């Protein structure tokens, strides 16, 4: 019964442009910086007969990485994906717990990505902008975002702050705990800077 489905944890959706956070981390890890990136957006990009446009065919012109992220330039991120390759993107996504168990106690659907099956350049292009077969739950993307905000550390989510008895006395309190470092503090600061420009 879909009305009983907790869409925050059990829903699985193509991430779309929020996948650009994953792509940005992949690029940063591969290059060590975002400062070397420059791209001339003409409004669309075509490879092997497959064309991906920017939203409404908008032409962003010459962009650096920060501008490409802030303007959600699809063609720039398609080019980034083609340059990085499937294996690099897949590894970074798995570092962020795609295809992995999440530290949550509610029923949830695992986020999935599979770029290793050779479906060619058009598939990689779509996947680079969060389309294709990649699926993620809203909860998972919120966890990744919170790790960026928390200097790379993913806190273990909890749902109950404290429990009181019938007299109003607190009998149990949940204490925040770190689950895992998803990225370095430096990486988190760089991603945070990108997100603040949106």
Model segments located where?
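Beta-lactam-recognizing serine transpeptidase/beta-lactamase-like catalytic domain environment
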Residues: 1-17, 22-198
């Amino acid at each position: 019964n879909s009305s009983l489905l907790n869409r925050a944890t059990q829903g699985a959706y193509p991430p779309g442009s929020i996948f650009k956070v994953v792509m940005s981390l992949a690029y940063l890890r591969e290059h060590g910086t975002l400062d070397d990136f420059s791209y001339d957006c003409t409004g669309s990009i075509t490879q092997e007969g497959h064309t991906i446009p920017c939203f409404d065919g908008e032409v962003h012109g010459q962009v650096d990485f920060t501008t490409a992220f802030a303007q959600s330039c699809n063609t720039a991120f398609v080019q980034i994906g083609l340059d990085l390759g499937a294996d690099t993107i897949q590894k970074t996504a798995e570092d962020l717990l795609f295809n992995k168990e999440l530290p949550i106690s509610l029923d949830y659907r695992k986020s999935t990505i599979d770029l290793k099956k050779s479906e060619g350049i058009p598939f990689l292009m779509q996947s680079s902008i969060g389309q294709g077969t990649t699926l993620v739950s809203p909860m998972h993307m919120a966890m990744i975002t919170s790790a960026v905000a928390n200097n790379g550390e993913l806190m273990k989510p909890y749902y109950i702050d404290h429990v009181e008895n019938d007299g109003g006395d607190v009998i149990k309190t949940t204490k925040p705990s770190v689950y895992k470092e998803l990225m370095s503090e430096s990486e988190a600061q760089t991603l945070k800077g990108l997100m603040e420009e949106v």
